Amino acid sequence: MKNRKVNFKKRYLSGIALVMGLIFISSCNDGDKGYKEYDPSLPVVIDEIYPDSGGYFDEVILRGENLGSDPKRLRVFFNQKEAIVVGASGDRALIHVPKLPGDECKIGMLLDGNTTDTVFCKQSFKYQKNYQLQYVCGQVGSTNATFVEGNFQTTEFGKNMFNLTADPEGVIYLNHRVTGTGGSLVYINENEFMTKFIAYGDGNAGEPAAPWYDKVTQKVYFTAMRKGYFWEVDPYDSYAVVLRQLVAPNAEYQAKGYRPYKNGDLMWCYSFVRAKDAKGEEWVYCRAYDGTLFRFKFEDRVYDVVGVCPSGAVDNFICGDPEDNTKIYCSLKQKNIVTCLDLSKDISDPGFETVVCGVGGMGGSVGDFQDGHSSIAKMNNPEQILLTRDPETSEKIMYVCDAKNCCVRQFNLATNMMTTVAGIGKQKGFSTGSPKESKLNWPIGICLSPNGDIYIADAGNRVIMKLMFL
């Protein structure tokens, strides 16, 4: 079904391009009967591009000499991205801007099958990146307490929809953080336009917390809030699910250096992440509400308490750094900050936990909204976060579900600048479109799909949204 929609879109865009090309060539022919065909004995020149800025699929005109009249003989590039050539008329060519070619674009042209002798435009082109928030599924304003599976037109998400993760096939996983039948684990398959129930919350384990896909085991794990439980889901075995529990270290493990939790059962555990300690040993880490950082391995499920994080007790979500597996990033909800744990250091080291963004130091601050440099940027109840690279600049960026501000923020770790990419700060609502028009209502979960799209769980509106970059 999805493939058919994609193909229809391509045919539709191709039809538009053909019509525009005919209009363009016709107008050029009427206004300038003396235009010439391409002459291989003469040089090809590109003097200017008009307009010299724009976004994805915008129309621009190249002006020059000896461009010919056959658009099929022209190949135009914005940096490394090839554009669609709609029409040509001797001294002009009509082009559609390609997707995400880079902020500052050098325009190059190859003509008549030549693959080496690129002709460059004397002007550059400024690409204006555009974020678009799109609806995926769910019923806006639903009052159902429980999840209703089905196709995208009938799916309803229950109360307390929460965090997201994606597997390599692009399937999205979501938890409902509540006990009983309201606390369901579900998956969302956009390729098949359907959602499916996996399991309910458990009386002993408590509310299902954040899902996390582990590349090592190739399974999805939903953390449970109580007693060290977690759900293990196998996407490659019909989503078979098993409820498992972490084990306290006995005398034998304690003799190896494992440390037990001293306050009874592990409680209020939110999310898992895989990372390496100072010795290069790989563990799965979790941070409890009271600030306790502990770790374990799936092979034996015996946990080891690392210590208490300097920032102390707070609702949190943790995520790893895809490029530095000694770092764990923590969004600290009530403190309105994001911190970084450096596992290459001892937990007693002053540099073990540092503030990445948000004001007020390790103690945090009262929630508010402010874009700008990290010295002034403010959040209000940050929830799930993720780290990735900007597809154009390759700068490391972090996306933050700024729940109470009803928006998604982007923090650039290279420039220390915070911007808003979806929703309008402090304005709840429901609206798709650009950052200036889109509205959210308590965005709480976020994940990155294999093809680079960002999915958002909007708990206030009871929908899944998708942030696309154009």
Where are the language model's segments positioned?
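Short loop/turn segments immediately following the C-termini of beta-strands
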Residues: 176-179, 223-227, 235, 277, ...
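Blade-level signature of beta-propeller repeat domains, shared across WD40, Kelch, NHL, RCC1
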Residues: 441-470
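Sec-dependent bacterial lipoprotein signal peptides
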Residues: 1-27
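Residue-level detector of Asp-centered blade-edge/turn motifs that repeat once per structural unit
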Residues: 166-169, 213-217, 275-280, 321-325, ...
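Conserved beta-propeller blade signature
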Residues: 171-174, 219-223, 281-287, 327-330, ...
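Hydrophobic core register within WD40 beta-propeller blades
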Residues: 163-164, 209-211, 270-274, 316-320, ...
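Ser/Thr/Pro-rich low-complexity tracts
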Residues: 28-135, 173, 186
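Gly/Pro-rich loop segments of beta-rich domains
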Residues: 62, 129-160, 191-209, 236-268, ...
